[in-house]
Amino acid sequence: MAEPRQEFDVMEDHAQGDYTLQDQEGDMDPGLKESPLQTPADDGSEEPGSETSDAKSTPTAEDATAPLVDEGAPGEQAAAQAPAEIPEGTAAEEAGIGDTSNLEDQAAGHVTQARMVSKGKDGTGPDDKKTKGADGKPGTKIATPRGAAPPGQKGQANATRIPAKTTPTPKTSPATMQVQKKPPPAGAKSERGESGKSGDRSGYSSPGSPGTPGSRSRTPSLPTPPTREPKKVAVVRTPPKSPSAAKSRLQAAPGPMPDLKNVKSKIGSTENLKHQPGGGKVQIINKKLDLSNVQSKCGSKDNIKHVPGGGSVQIVYKPVDLSKVTSKCGSLGNIHHKPGGGQVEVKSEKLDFKDRVQSKIGSLDNITHVPGGGNKKIETHKLTFRENAKAKTDHGAEIVYKSPVVSGDTSPRHLSNVSSTGSIDMVDSPQLATLADEVSASLAKQGL
């Protein structure tokens, strides 16, 4: 109970600041400026006495939707005063919208209300606040002992507001409203403000539990006499519920809200929400390498103190002792020998071959011999068979031989002469002449 109590103290201070501003500006024309806490039907906030009594009373369906209106900005409340509060079931006269002539009465009533709030803060006890909250509660919404709703819920509740009352509210006649809202004399402003509140709000009793909706009185009460003693009305009170239960009722009123606790993303990223990537845990450790036990591939470190043998070779220069050296052929042993060839004398004597030399065949002896074959002569005689040839048979033709040797005499020779009586003259027969020429030519080719 300590935490809701602290919230109500803050809300009382907030409401007191609004009323003091209204008290300072009460002389202004009420038609030009309307405070966000102008009428009881326009604003959900109440005097500190009514707030404390409502904090102790049972939260109903009206209380569940009340923070969505009360905790808004004053500019939003002023903009949504006339169209938002009419569906609550209150009459136009109670809301202060129907008659423009009632604005002055309402402004005067609010000035007295602000002054009564300051007096209640100074001297009145909690009993007076309780009864005032119980008597003067119209069909408006009171702040519940819950914290301020988030802006998302505020806009949602303003958009989808549901009338909380199920039974129609009784309308007061215009005559009674004028009688109740007549401005009293200046001396009795405080009593008139208290009586006006109780008269306007006496048509409603304090909301009971949800199970007893018939406990509300629907008959408007007459204006109370101007006395300071508050009128006590029996109030059925139940222990206040936890904020979680009220929050569940608040969510059930505008409509079913989606269950956002079981929502999963498409790729299941909420399941791995606490997962940290392994790349961030990689530590680059800089360790010095221990090279004391490192061995080379070829084992060169084992032989690091080895001195190569080539470097230890010393070139010693020793003079060669040639005293005992002997040649291969023993020339030094015979170094003093003189060759005998040097003493040989070449003598040249002219030989007399003619006197001593004889030929093998004794040619010189027979030098004057004349061979006998030298006296023989080879005679060559030309055979003249053609010239002397005769035909075996005497056919009466004269054979004319023409020698192949060109001679000056081109006339054919008559080989034979036939008697004039039976002879054939070659001149007279040219065919025989050509035949004889052909035969002689063929014989000449054969070499005959």
Curated annotation (Swiss-Prot):
Keywords: Acetylation, Cell membrane, Cell projection, Cytoplasm, Cytoskeleton, Disulfide bond, Glycoprotein, Isopeptide bond, Membrane, Methylation, Microtubule, Phosphoprotein, Repeat, Secreted, Ubl conjugation. InterPro entries: MAP2/MAP4/Tau, MAP_tubulin-bd_rpt, Tau. GO terms for cellular component: axon; cytoplasm; cytosol; dendrite; extracellular region; microtubule; plasma membrane. It is found in: Cytoplasm, Cytosol; Cell membrane; Cytoplasm, Cytoskeleton; Cell projection, Axon. Residues 1-264, 405-424 are annotated as: Disordered. Transmembrane segments: none annotated. Expressed in neurons. There is a cross-link at residues 33, 261, 266, 274, 288, 305, 318, 324, 328, 338, 350, 354, 360, 376, 382, 392 (Glycyl lysine isopeptide (Lys-Gly) (interchain with G-Cter in ubiquitin)). The modification N6-acetyllysine is found at residues 154, 232, 266, 288, 297, 305, 318, 324, 328, 338, 350, 354, 376, 392. The modification Omega-N-methylarginine is found at residues 146, 356. The modification N6,N6-dimethyllysine is found at residues 154, 318. Pfam families: Tubulin-binding. Promotes microtubule assembly and stability, and might be involved in the establishment and maintenance of neuronal polarity. The C-terminus binds axonal microtubules while the N-terminus binds neural plasma membrane components, suggesting that tau functions as a linker protein between both. Axonal polarity is predetermined by tau localization (in the neuronal cell) in the domain of the cell body defined by the centrosome. The short isoforms allow plasticity of the cytoskeleton whereas the longer isoforms may preferentially play a role in its stabilization. Interacts with MARK1, MARK2, MARK3 and MARK4. Interacts with SQSTM1 when polyubiquitinated. Interacts with PSMC2 through SQSTM1. Interacts with FKBP4. Binds to CSNK1D. Interacts with SGK1. Interacts with PIN1. Interacts with LRRK2. Interacts with LRP1, leading to endocytosis; this interaction is reduced in the presence of LRPAP1/RAP. The tau/MAP repeat binds to tubulin. Type I isoforms contain 3 repeats while type II isoforms contain 4 repeats. This is Microtubule-associated protein tau.
